[in-house]
């Protein structure tokens, strides 16, 4: 279910960024946060790799950077969940924002390794900071929605098996 939703999201996002319809919010990071929080870590890591490679299908870049950045994002979520209260709203916002910021910084650092002509780093950093904050705020609304969907699916499965 998460993979289908994420592939649809990545497709819509790539089309909307080309047409500049809406601001970019990374729902894949929010799904990874949810999977680490409520499911197994191995599911979250596999999801991160699959979504990274599917995102690379729609972009032109160096193969493997996006999955690696999602894996680092997963590690940031796992480590920061030990220090922050991820059940509270500020903890969720800060954890998802840290993960998104780390993911984007790793992505930019790898691009800078291969292309040294990126001069507007400060303006990119401001954009990434705003994107990370918006993704963290949006995660507060999406996580309860995912919890409710998961609860409804579990109830449906238990009713069908009985």
Where are these regions (language model features)?
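Terminal, non-globular segments
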Residues: 1-162
